[in-house]
Amino acid sequence: MNRRELAGRLQTMGTASRAALAKSLGLSQPTAGKIVDQLLKEGIVEEIDTTAEPGAAKAGRPPQLLRLDRRHRRFLAIQLGVTDTRLATLPVGVAEEDHWDFQFPTPACAQAWRAGLAKIARRIARTEFWGVLVSIPGVVDEQTGRVVFSPNLHWTEGDKLPSLIRSVWDAPVVLVQEERALALGHQVVKPGAPGFLLVDFGEGIGSALLVRGRLQTNPLPISGEIGHTPVFGNTRWCGCGARGCLETLVSRRGLLQSLAEHSKRRNPQWAVLVQRTQQRGVEPWLARTLDQTAIVIAGALNMVGLQQVIITGALLELTPEVFRHLAQAITCGAMWGRFGKIEVQPAPRRRMAGLIASGLDRLIWPASQAQERSGHEFASAPN
């Protein structure tokens, strides 16, 4: 039993006493208490003052409750998106849903992006962080901090991003492929599923697999590029250089292009599509796109042997009938649907929770374990 497991259990429970944590993990209270004391010292866990709660005095001395630290902003999170870049300072005990503090349009070159970061940095009071956690699209080698290929943001390719970010904030930088961050965040907030395929719709369409509580890893850094599956009959060119990719149909841009073609509107905005689906439901052109999307997702389920799909992103902004159509089509196409139940669930994006989990896994737990082996305590960041 280590810090990681106890902190993970506390994340699931929300708040708990030392005794409750010990019982849930099958530990003796002294053992659990020792781990808790270490986490308190490291600034990962905090104690909650329950003496001010109504009825506390009447019930006698209540047990001291614990939770993941929510007071101290330990990390800086960055979402590098195709159209916008968002930033937030985050504690270890992050909220279940994302709320970003700062935003600026993602520019077309690295130096302009750095200038945008520097401008935001002047507005952030805290200057020392345990790490800078970056959600990034494309094919990302997370271990080496290199963007192998980014169809929609070619300027991010290579290994320049970590050093560019460190020129603004002097802290370790962790790159996390964006759909993997979303899947990990969903698992942190909603634990217990044996596995799921998360599919996110936005400026592109990507996915991530989580099996037995862990993100799937592969020999190659590429994974989850479901949006670059070619669709028969689709002649649109994709930013990856290929023709016919699924995301040219079902990304925001792809859906708006189809709306323009079928409504004779020039350059319709997303709000127009939202309103149109509310008024007309799933029109034939949209039904075809959803059916083609479902075929690709069902094929992925058939390949990996999962029964749960988590849908996040732009499609959920349309009328609920759109989600229901997609869910039914996935169920019809997945082979397990003939024997058992296919679960297709909508969910909010939980990118921040995934980034924090990645930061702890790749920066904090290895450092504390190494220092423990050497006989030194892990030094928390300044308050």
For each feature predicted by the language model, list its residue ranges:
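Short glycine-rich anion-binding loops that position phosphate/pyrophosphate groups of nucleotides
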Residues: 137-140, 202-204, 315-316
